[in-house]
Amino acid sequence: MKKVITSGVYDILNLGHINILTEAKKLGNYLVCCVQADESVINSKKIAPILNTAERVNQIKALGFVDEVIVYDEIDQRELWGKIKPSIIVQGDDYLYSGERIEAIRYIINNKIRLILQI
């Protein structure tokens, strides 16, 4: 099984989010969308999301083509990736420029995971 994982806040799901998720789904046969929890968003962005975690999760589920939706609260997603074991990680183009990513990139390389930025 080729698992594809993508993650984000998804605060007010928009066409850009839907396009990324649609394209990510085409890359494998199982799409996991990870939604950042409210407290984690507040801690990292210093602002609360407009929609709460449950509302954002329900929007993703309502799309009907995402196979699994997981809530995460750690900015460092290596532990999450270790549990899901994705073949491909899809991120927005801001991924490399937001926070310390050296260890995450090392993890991706060491585990032979394909990283795709901005589909």
Report each predicted region and the residues it spans.
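Nucleotidyltransferase catalytic core that binds NTPs
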Residues: 1-119
